[in-house]
Amino acid sequence: MTEPKYWQQSKEFLSKADPSLEELLLKHEDYIISSRGEALETLLRAIVGQQISVQAAASVWGKLANKIGQIKPENVLSLSFDDLKACGLSKQKTQYLINICNHFISFSIKDHSHWEDRSFESVYQELITIKGVGPWTAEMFGMFYLLEQDIFPIKDIGIIRAMNQIYGDGNILSKNQIIEISEQWKPYRSVACWFLWKSIDSEDVQY
């Protein structure tokens, strides 16, 4: 797995910018956000992980990966809808996986060259044209495949929960309050989010 070049610098920046994060950074200093280096796998894992716990997602993915074998679009599409769904997916998620694989085949996406030298906004706009890939899934792709350093998935349930605990003393923060707090983390909001996830779940978030 690949470690971001900005990792150490970002932790130093965040420790100074936000004292509330400093304790988290020290507690989890040995943990690093990383990329699997596989675009398709990252997207499929993000779909599997939508709105379920890290542990539940790992269980479903294990069954799915075992059935697919090598993670290639043609291998996924060679399985029937029911075979995919039987791994623990909803009907919607099953269709979303198929949609992503069809996109990879239609655009002949075989390696990183399709994504390199592009802005995240360009990649984001492409991804959300795929039915089932919304803002959150595209943001996870940016964070965990492209290793973009300044992504803030504002609708992520885990991020909201962690911020309520740390900055709201358990009270529910408004969207504007969440945005205002996150401003101090720029240009390393992806890193701040990763440590917020660690604060509520001992399992690493990894797509």
Model-derived regions: residue spans:
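A positional/architectural concept
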Residues: 9, 15-69
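Alpha-helical ds-nucleic-acid-binding substructure associated with the helix-hairpin-helix region
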Residues: 20, 24, 52-53, 57-129, ...
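Alpha-helix N-cap and coil->helix boundary residues
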Residues: 35, 55, 59, 71, ...
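Short alpha-helical scaffolding segments that buttress acidic/His motifs in well-ordered protein cores
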Residues: 43-48, 97-101, 141, 192-196
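Structural motif
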Residues: 33-41, 88-91, 182-189
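C-terminal accessory module of base-excision DNA glycosylases/AP lyases that mediates lesion recognition
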Residues: 1-31, 120-121, 135-207
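A general alpha-helix detector
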Residues: 42-47, 79-83, 122-126, 140, ...
